[in-house]
Amino acid sequence: VEPLAAALEIPSQVHLSPEKNVAIIGDGRLALMIAQVVSLYGVDLTIIGKHEDKLKKFEKLGKTRHIDGETYEVVIDATGSPGGMEMAQNIVRKRGTIVLKSTYAGNLNLNMSYFVVNEITIVGSRCGPFEPALNLLNRGLVELPEIELWDLRDYEKAFASHSFKSGFKFPV
């Protein structure tokens, strides 16, 4: 439920409406939760990811192809890697907003004057409300990604599983 609650923090921080052009960078579990929440607002949504198999899960929520040169009013970085912020900087419109859902180890090397000159707002976004997340689940408005459950004694099988190799988190 936590990734869904984190996704629900975004609409409390950024105004979303049908006329907004929004991009989500990332194709993992958190990005999937964010895409489901953001799509409830009727935005023009594009999901940008590197894994064709993962992007198939997003097709009913928005476009899964970024067109070179296209820019967005709101860009949400859910990659977990510094390259996500670099891409966000390249595709956000002037006077647009970048929402950072990623936490990076170490520092990013950014030219901050670019954000000032182009009047780009950067919003840090972390945890969110659990009760509304549970409400969305109970009403069937969002679906949680499939997870694999493992007994602790089967930890070797868990680490050898497809979910671990594909970068999805799972409880042991």
Residue spans for each PLM region:
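Mid-domain Rossmann-like dinucleotide-binding core that forms the NAD(H)/NADP(H) cofactor-binding site
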Residues: 1-69
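A general structural signal for well-ordered alpha-helical segments in protein cores
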Residues: 4-7, 31, 72, 85, ...
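Glycine-rich cofactor phosphate-binding loops and adjacent beta1-alpha1 units
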Residues: 14, 56-120
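Short active-site oxyanion
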Residues: 43-45, 119-122, 144
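Structural detector of well-ordered beta-strand residues that form the stable sheet scaffold
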Residues: 46, 97-100, 123, 167
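N-terminal Rossmann-fold cofactor-binding loop
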Residues: 47-51, 78, 126-127
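C-terminal hydrophobic helical "lid"/dimerization subdomain
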Residues: 86, 131-172
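Rossmann-like dinucleotide-binding domain for NAD(H)/NADP(H)
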Residues: 122-123, 136
